[in-house]
């Protein structure tokens, strides 16, 4: 069960039998719920009752809502002694019941009884200790941002009609608009209130956290008060003065994080009192348009538009759009013509009630694509890398941009350019024409930048905090692709994670499992060095569970753990003779040789049992270690072999015999050493239900003489004492049981990923899991942040390749990298595969059909411009009509 939950916490509140009469009257005075009579069960009562004394209520009842009153006027109205009243008014301001105003001819301090939202409900929630002591004020804010609007929202015209908050676009997105509205420019308001700015905490982030629906942002300093509000925040200890330069830093950080700029919208076109930087997952103001499905409640004067012909389908706009207005679609025409995408229904000419609302908007706005699908490459990739995007960038010579785009999802592009199982290529639409685009070869070319310390790409740290990097200590147990990916994305978000690796060098199976003739270790080292420069601390030679325990790490201050130790053990065949000298597991053999001992000798004949890529790696490695005859035996037929076709062809080219349909029966020994193996005929591998259940003909056997037998029939997890005393449950294959979305185990601070969760799998799967683990841990270490709300489920749909009208494509053949003729590709441990030339990359990237494109629904767009800060091709916002702010 996640910490914080996905549903709002209910604070304990029992209406009193004898309500405080003055609080009822004050609640009724301020409420904007038309025709509603406030009772002790209402938020108007329990919100005020928590903080407001009867004496305060008496004074407030002498005031008019939103009508400024000087101290002298208050003395006259209440009959109280001036000094006593001034102290009381100050206390009322400190808790948030009152605000200040100096906008009068004498520039005289005036006290204002504000409305609830925006107003006292927010001010109540700008002091965390106040909310924690009285969580009912958090509910008060949430309810008063909801209840008064239920019947109003369908009638709100563009611009917001002076209700609540108004989205103001990213200024860079509208700089080129010739007739842009001045009030839609943040600079207009900063100029108007020049020199009078203060930063305070976000009341939405604070209050939603107390209610258990928080995000993982640091709440401090996202609310920028201007003019009188700046002074109010400082004088009531809710904020601090900042310079214009600091304002710009906060605004830029907000844009980097995908937050939406909003300004207050209750004082007409000539006045605001705050600029907020809002996370849609917790913002009560953005909720008014998103939950009620009425964009006019928020939208600016602008709407986004994608230039489809230029869109590279990177999907960044989709990922960040707070309103779910952008989704992935397709650029290619179907046999019936161009796809027309549905538009969001609006309340303009439709009866609008609760059945039209979207209570799950935070999750639904994270749906990535239309049901008709998008680019197959992005869909098929476990990490959902923007393949089409980086191919187009490479075609334009924008190699650093392409590398940056890949690293949004994969910190190991150079590694994956060499050893990925390229499901993107298997799914590539171009493959229906001739041959798939050589996606991994292009990725390898791009990632060559990472092998040079002068050109490698180190992503900027983007943390949702205005107070620097996060202090929480996080431990990653296992330095393989899952663990290192988790560390990479945590570091990119502002953490300083520590990786504990039991081996002498990090990399896991990338170093100790994949032979150097496929993946040179300097390639792995270079990409790990990027992580170090990003802030990841890697401690090698430390086995957690042996050298130090999880509990000891907790005492050192570690708040979360990501366990990704992989499957380092082997499985036995359960046959006679498998303990003989000369029998070795594939994992152990590769660990010795790939881990740095390439001088290891294998004399004589070798038999490899297994039909996967690991078995092929063993066969090829044995040959390089001197074995004069290598044979592979597997249960499956050649078409059923789990190994990739390319791998099978390569091992055959190197002289190994691949014998399908045989399983081990007995290993023959002489004086305790292997001298041969008896194999039995496999009739079938799976039963009628598809489960692994091999059937053999015990009478049909074959004996093969050999001196070495390598068993590549499965891997196991070596937990040791790592989980001693923990609540982590183990399931199928002795793997950790965890939530399939968050990877959180039964021990709340322990998350798992990679092979310890899935069983033996591919590097790209582990990389994808590592990024999700980082997202979960980021949420977990921030108190009361939801583990699931507003989380991108990373679900994509492949377009229908059978229903495409493919015309006018480039006729070039697939480009292939040359081999280095100075290297013996069959016996050397060096990688003989060269990289594509720049000219080949241009030819190959031109073969991409450009299947996908982002599609904007203008009816959902709120004109925030966040998409323009993420777009890597061409998306812009324009002014469809003069919507503006309504006075």
Identify the meaning behind each predicted range.
Residues 499, 503-538, 619-666, 787-800:
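Rossmann-like dinucleotide-binding cores of NAD(P)H-dependent redox enzymes
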Residues 108-144:
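Short, amphipathic alpha-helical interaction segments positioned at domain boundaries
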Residues 579-603, 687-760:
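FAD-site-proximal beta/loop scaffold in flavoenzymes
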Residues 473-496, 616-623:
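N-terminal Rossmann-like FAD-binding beta1-loop-alpha1 element of flavoenzymes
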Residues 93-104, 326-327:
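A short, conserved structural fragment
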Residues 875-886:
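Single conserved hydrophobic/aromatic residue that forms the stacking wall/gate
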Residues 446-468, 493, 526-546, 570-625, ...:
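Glycine-rich dinucleotide-binding loop and its adjacent helix/turn
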Residues 756-781:
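A conserved FAD-binding loop/helix module that cradles the flavin
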């Amino acid at each position: 069960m996640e910490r914080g939950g996905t549903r709002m916490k209910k604070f304990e509140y029992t209406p009193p039998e004898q309500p405080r009469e003055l609080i009822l009257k004050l609640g009724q005075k301020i409420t904007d719920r038309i025709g509603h009579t406030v009772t002790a069960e209402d938020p108007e009562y329990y919100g005020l009752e928590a903080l407001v004394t009867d004496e305060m209520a008496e004074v407030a009842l002498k005031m008019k809502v939103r009508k400024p009153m000087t101290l002298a006027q208050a003395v006259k109205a209440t009959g109280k002694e001036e000094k006593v009243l001034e102290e009381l008014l100050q206390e009322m301001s400190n808790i948030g019941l009152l605000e200040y105003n100096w906008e009068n001819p004498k520039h005289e301090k005036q006290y204002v009884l504000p409305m609830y939202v925006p107003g006292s409900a927010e001010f109540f929630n700008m002091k965390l200790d106040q909310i924690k002591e009285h969580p009912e004020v958090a509910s008060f804010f949430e309810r008063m941002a909801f209840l008064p609007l239920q019947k109003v929202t369908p009638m709100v015209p563009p611009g917001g009609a002076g209700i609540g908050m108004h989205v103001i676009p990213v200024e860079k997105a509208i700089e080129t608009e010739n007739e842009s509205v001045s009030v839609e420019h943040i600079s207009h308001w900063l100029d108007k209130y020049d020199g009078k700015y203060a930063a305070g905490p976000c009341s939405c982030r604070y209050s939603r956290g107390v209610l258990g629906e928080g995000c993982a942002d640091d709440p401090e300093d996202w609310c920028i008060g201007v003019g009188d509000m700046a002074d109010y925040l400082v004088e009531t200890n809710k904020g601090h003065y900042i310079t214009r330069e600091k304002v710009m830093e906060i605004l830029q950080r907000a844009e980097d994080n995908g937050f939406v700029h909003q300004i207050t919208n209750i004082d007409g076109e000539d006045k605001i009192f705050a600029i907020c930087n809002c996370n849609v997952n917790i913002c009560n103001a953005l909720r008014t348009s998103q939950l009620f499905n009425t964009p006019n409640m928020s939208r600016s004067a602008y709407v986004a538009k994608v230039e489809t012909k230029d869109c590279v389908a990177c999907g960044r706009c989709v990922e960040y759009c707070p309103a779910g207005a952008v989704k992935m679609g397709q650029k290619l025409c179907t046999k019936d013509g161009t796809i027309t995408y549905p538009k969001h229904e609006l309340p303009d000419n439709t009866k609008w009630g609760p059945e039209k609302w979207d209570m799950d908007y935070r999750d639904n706005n994270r749906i990535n694509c239309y049901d008709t699908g998008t680019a197959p490459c992005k869909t098929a990739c476990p990490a959902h890398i923007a393949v089409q995007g980086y191919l187009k960038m490479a075609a334009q010579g924008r190699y650093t941009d392409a590398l940056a785009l890949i690293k949004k999802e994969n910190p190991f592009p150079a590694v994956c350019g060499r050893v990925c199982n390229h499901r993107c290529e298997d799914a590539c639409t171009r493959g229906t024409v001739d041959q798939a685009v050589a996606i991994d070869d292009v990725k390898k070319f791009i990632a060559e930048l990472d092998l040079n310390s002068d050109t490698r790409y180190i992503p900027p740290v983007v943390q949702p905090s205005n107070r620097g990097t996060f202090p929480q200590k996080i431990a990653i147990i296992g330095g393989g692709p899952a663990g290192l990916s988790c560390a990479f994305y945590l570091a990119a978000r502002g953490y300083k994670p520590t990786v504990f690796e039991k081996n002498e060098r990090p990399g896991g199976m990338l170093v100790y499992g994949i032979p150097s003739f496929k993946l040179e270790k300097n390639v792995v080292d270079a990409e790990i060095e990027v992580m170090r420069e990003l802030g990841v601390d890697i401690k090698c030679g430390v086995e957690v569970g042996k050298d130090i325990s999880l509990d000891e790490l907790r005492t050192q201050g570690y708040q979360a753990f990501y366990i990704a130790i992989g499957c380092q053990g082997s499985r036995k065949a359960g046959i006679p003779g498998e303990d003989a000298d000369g029998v070795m597991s594939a994992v152990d053999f590769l660990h010795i040789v790939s881990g740095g001992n390439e001088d290891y000798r294998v004399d004589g004949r070798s038999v490899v049992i297994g039909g996967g890529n690991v078995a092929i790696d063993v066969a090829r490695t044995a040959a390089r270690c001197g074995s004069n005859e290598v044979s592979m035996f597997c249960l499956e037929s050649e078409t059923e072999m789990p190994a990739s076709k390319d791998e099978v062809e390569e091992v055959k080219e190197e002289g190994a015999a691949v014998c399908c349909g045989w399983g081990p029966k007995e290993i023959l020994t002489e004086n305790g050493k292997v001298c041969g193996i008896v194999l039995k005929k496999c009739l079938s591998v799976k039963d009628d239900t598809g489960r692994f259940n091999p059937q053999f003909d015990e009478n049909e056997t074959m004996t093969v003489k050999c001196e070495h037998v390598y068993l590549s029939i499965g891997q196991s997890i070596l937990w040791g004492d790592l989980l001693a005393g923990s609540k982590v449950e183990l399931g199928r294959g002795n793997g950790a049981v965890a939530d399939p979305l968050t990877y959180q185990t039964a021990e709340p601070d322990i998350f798992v990923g990679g092979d310890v969760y899935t069983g033996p799998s591919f590097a790209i799967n582990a990389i994808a899991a590592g990024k999700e683990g980082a997202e979960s841990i980021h949420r977990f270490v921030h108190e009361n942040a939801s583990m699931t709300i507003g989380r991108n489920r990373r679900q994509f749909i492949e377009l229908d390749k059978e229903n495409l009208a493919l015309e006018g494509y480039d006729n070039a053949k697939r480009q292939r990298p040359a081999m280095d003729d100075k290297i013996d590709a069959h016996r050397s441990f060096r990688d003989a595969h060269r990289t594509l030339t720049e000219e080949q990359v241009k030819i190959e990237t031109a073969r991409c059909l450009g299947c996908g494109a982002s599609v904007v629904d203008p009816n959902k767009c709120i004109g925030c411009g966040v998409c323009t800060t993420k777009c890597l091709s061409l998306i812009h916002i324009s002014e469809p009509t003069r919507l503006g702010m309504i006075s």
